[in-house]
Amino acid sequence: MGIFSIANQHIRFAVKLATAIVLALFVGFHFQLETPRWAVLTAAIVAAGPAFAAGGEPYSGAIRYRGFLRIIGTFIGCIAGLVIIIAMIRAPLLMILVCCIWAGFCTWISSLVRIENSYAWGLAGYTALIIVITIQPEPLLTPQFAVERCSEIVIGIVCAIMADLLFSPRSIKQEVDRELESLLVAQYQLMQLCIKHGDGEVVDKAWGDLVRRTTALQGMRSNLNMESSRWARANRRLKAINTLSLTLITQSCETYLIQNTRPELITDTFREFFDTPVETAQDVHKQLKRLRRVIAWTGERETPVTIYSWVAAATRYQLLKRGVISNTKINATEEEILQGEPEVKVESAERHHAMVNFWRTTLSCILGTLFWLWTGWTSGSGAMVMIAVVTSLAMRLPNPRMVAIDFIYGTLAALPLGLLYFLVIIPNTQQSMLLLCISLAVLGFFLGIEVQKRRLGSMGALASTINIIVLDNPMTFHFNQFLDSALGQIVGCVLAFTVILLVRDKSRDRTGRVLLNQFVSAAVSAMTTNVARRKENHLPALYQQLFLLMNKFPGDLPKFRLALTMIIAHQRLRDAPIPVNEDLSAFHRQMRRTADHVISARSDDKRRRYFGQLLEELEIYQEKLRIWQAPPQVTEPVHRLTGMLHKYQHALTDS
C-alpha cells in the first residue's frame, strides 16, 4: 500500500470525522458562539483520538466514553481554574505558578489511575491553565469564559457522538465471541505443553502470549460494556471469564513446575490423554467431557490437584462462554459461578514514575511562564497552553518522547496547511456556510485517513490546524496573529520535548523491584486463617502487575518466571488447609507487616534488613507448622516459597 493510498476500511471513519467537524461548525455558528473553533476542535479530538489509538475505526462506545471523560475533565478544570482565580487574582504571577502545579498534580493522578480514565485528569490539568491564561487581560469575565468553554466543548462532544451513531459504528461483540473460542483452544494447548514438560522457552512464550490475550480480552470487555446496556449480562460473564482464564494459566504453569521435582505425579494416563491434538473449541469440548469421565473413574485423590483444578476452571469457562455468545438470561449454575470472591485492588507500583511525570509537567509549564514573561511575546500564552497539553497527555503513555515528537511534526505540518486555509480557502468560503463546511470536511476526511494509519504527526496536525485557522464569530483575518499562534504552538511543543529529554525517567528499575516485592507480599498474605481474607480474589490484580512487568522489561524471562512462581505460590497457599489457632494467626499478621515494610522501604539497607527479617520469620513459621502438625499441602508450598526468596534475595532488595 502506497503512502498516499486510501484503503476501503478507512473511508467510513474518515467520513464520520468529517461529519463530526461539519456538525460542530454548523451548530457553533448557528447558536452564535463566540469561538466555534473550540466546538470543532473538541469534535475532531474526541472522534480522532480513539481511532489513532486503535489504528483504525474505533469500536462502538469508544467515542462516547472519551466524550464523557472530556466533559468530566473540562468541568473539573473549569472549577479548579475559577477557585484559583478567586483566591489569587491579586497576585497574577503566583496564580499562574499555582496553575502550573495544578497541571503537574493532575498528571500525577493520571499516572496512578486506570489508563482509560487518565484522559480526564490530564484534561483537567491544562483546562485550568487555559482559563487562567486566557482571562489575563479581563479577569472579571472568568465565569462567562468558563461557561462558554464548557458549552462549546459539550456541543463538540455531542456532535462527535451523533456522527458516530449516524455511521453505524462496528460492534466488538463478534470479536469477543471469536476470541473466547480461540482462547480456550490456546489454554488447552498450553496445558499440553506443560504436561509434555518440553522446552522451557516455548512454554514461557506460550503462557506470556496467553497473559497478553487475556488482558486484551479484558479490554474488549470494557469496550463491550461501553457499547450498550444490552450487553450487561455478557459483561458479568466476561468479568468471571477473566479470572478463570488466569486460573487456567496458573494451573498449567504449576503443572510444569511440579514436574521439575516430582515428575511421577503426572501419571501416564494423563500424559497419553493430553497427547491428542486439538484445533477447535469443539475439539476441546469433546476432550473435556472425556477428561471429566477419566477423573470420575480414577478418583479425585488419584488426580493431580493442578489438573483437577484446571478441568474445573475450563468447565466453568465453557459454560460462561456459551452464555456470552448467546447473551441469554443468567441461569442458577452461572449465578453461582458469578457470585465469586471479591477482587482486590492493588496499590500502584508506579508512584516514583508518577512523581517524575509531576515534575516534568510542572517544570515545563513554569519554563513556559518564564519564557512568556521574559520575551513578552504575544503568543507566549499559546506556547504555554501547548506545553501543558503535550506534557499532560504524553506522560501517561509508554513513550512520552515519541508523543512529543508527534506533536512537533503535527504543529510543523499545521503551519503550511493552516496558511492555505487562512489565506486562500476560508476568505473565499466564509460568505457561504455550505462552502465553509465542505472545505473543513475535506480537511477532516484526509486527515482522518492518516490518523487511522497512525501516521507520525497526523493527530497533532489535525488539532493544530483547526486551532490556528480563523473559526471565530465574527471572523477576523490578522496575519500577525495567525503567525504568532502557529509559531507559539511549535515553540511550546519544542519546549515540552526539551523538558521531557532533560528530566530523565529512571524509575523503570525501581518499578520492577516494587512489582516483584508486591508479588512476594501477595504470597505471604495468602498465609492466613482469616476466612474473609482467604476468599479475596487477588488473581486479576497479580496478573495485571505481571502484564505491567512484561511491558516494562520485554524479554526479561527470569523476572517473568519469578513473578509467575510467586503467583503460583499465592494460589497454592490460599487453598492450603492451614491449622487454625491464635499462635499462627498472630504470626501471619507479623509476616504481613514485615512484607509491607519491604515494599515501603526507601533505601537498600532498610529493604535488605526487612527482607532478612522476613526470611527469618519464614524459617520460624516452618518450625511452627511442624509443631502444629500441618499437612504437606501447607508445608511444601511454604518451603518452596522460602527457597525462592533465598535464591532471589539480591534481585528483590538491591537497586
Curated annotation (Swiss-Prot):
Give the gene name.
aaeB
Can you name the source organism?
A: Escherichia coli O7:K1 (strain IAI39 / ExPEC)
Record-linked NCBIfam families: PRK10631.1
Which GO MF term does the entry hold, naming one?
Answer: transmembrane transporter activity
Q: What is its main location?
A: membrane
Q: Which GO terms of the cellular component aspect does the record hold?
A: plasma membrane
What is one Gene Ontology biological process annotated in the Swiss-Prot or TrEMBL record?
carboxylic acid transport
Family as reported in the entry's similarity comment = Belongs to the aromatic acid exporter ArAE (TC 2.A.85) family.
Segments spanning the bilayer are 13-33, 38-58, 69-89, 93-113, 121-141, 152-172, 370-390, 407-427, 431-451, 459-479, 482-502
State the protein's name: p-hydroxybenzoic acid efflux pump subunit AaeB
Q: What does this protein do?
A: Forms an efflux pump with AaeA. Could function as a metabolic relief valve, allowing to eliminate certain compounds when they accumulate to high levels in the cell.
Localisation per UniProt entry? Cell inner membrane
